[in-house]
Swiss-Prot record:
Keyword Methyltransferase tagged: no
Name of the protein this chain belongs to: Small ribosomal subunit protein uS2c
Keyword vocabulary terms for this entry: Chloroplast, Plastid, Ribonucleoprotein, Ribosomal protein
Pfam families documented for this protein: Ribosomal_S2
GO biological process, one term: translation
Superkingdom assignment: Eukaryota
An example Gene Ontology CC term for this record: chloroplast
GO function term, MF aspect, one: structural constituent of ribosome
Protein localization: Plastid, Chloroplast
InterPro entries attached to this UniProt entry: Ribosomal_uS2 (IPR001865), Ribosomal_uS2_bac/mit/plastid (IPR005706), Ribosomal_uS2_flav_dom_sf (IPR023591)
Chloroplast among keywords: yes
Entry similarity comment: Belongs to the universal ribosomal protein uS2 family.
């Protein structure tokens, strides 16, 4: 796809608090190029850099989506969990929003078996299979299903490793980042002033704690993916 204008508005970013970083004493020096100033002990993110990298990220995901490739969105902390799920559902992406289980990507063969178990249990529940089990066995199966749905429900139908992973809060999702790096899966990360931008293929400098900031970034990426999918469907 040709690069597009993604309606990235500095005033909207200000209103969403995208510019508000962490306490200066907690910063990662690698974020220096993305910091505009320090105010009352808080680092202020340079929104022109945020706009540039947001646009680059949107172009990237739109291109990937236009080729019919798959995404996984990751955001498990409480501020991001429901926003991650809603953005992923909007863009028809897989997502992880409860807890990143070690080996989700690097131990994919085992994860595939867990996902098949989830689908089997779900099918058994829908067809009344639990009702035909002894009470204790039914309770165990229902417990297994609830646990699997909680942690794996967002990737239930992920048939292979994702082509791109988007991540909210790089520090919180350090295991996910490491697995992506190990497998050479490109990442787009929302990075606050305490993060290492070098770990992401496309870092988007932004407040990773405020819900409005997370929503703003997630919505832009989801919209760009949707645009890319439209192009793929036309072809």
């Amino acid at each position: 796809m040709e690069p597009k204008y993604w309606n990235i508005n500095l005033e909207e970013m200000m209103e969403a608090g995208v510019h508000s970083g962490h306490q200066a004493r907690k910063w990662n020096p690698k974020m220096a190029p993305y910091i505009f100033a320090e105010r009352k002990g808080i680092h202020i993110i340079n929104l022109t850099r945020t706009a540039r990298f947001s646009s680059e990220a949107c172009d990237s995901v739109a291109n990937v989506a236009s080729e019919g490739k798959q995404f996984s969105m990751v955001g498990t902390k409480y501020q991001a969990a429901d926003l991650t799920a809603s953005a992923a559902i909007k863009a028809r992406c897989h997502y992880v929003n409860k807890k990143w289980l070690g080996g989700m990507l690097t131990n994919w063969s085992t994860m595939e078996k867990r996902l098949q178990k989830l689908r089997d249990l779900e099918n058994k529940e829908k067809t009344g299979g639990f009702d035909r089990l002894p009470e204790k066995e039914a309770a165990i199966s229902k417990g297994q299903l609830a646990k699997l749905k909680k942690y794996l429900g967002g990737i239930e139908y992920m048939a292979s490793l994702p082509d791109v992973v988007t991540i909210v809060d790089q520090r919180e999702e350090s295991i996910a980042i490491k697995e992506c790096i190990t497998l050479n899966i490109p990442t787009i990360c929302l990075v606050d002033t305490d993060c290492d931008p070098d770990l992401a293929d496309i870092p988007i400098p932004a407040n990773d704690d405020a819900r409005a900031s997370i929503r703003w970034i997630s919505d832009k990426l989801a919209s760009a993916i949707c645009e890319g999918r439209k192009s793929y469907m036309k072809d």
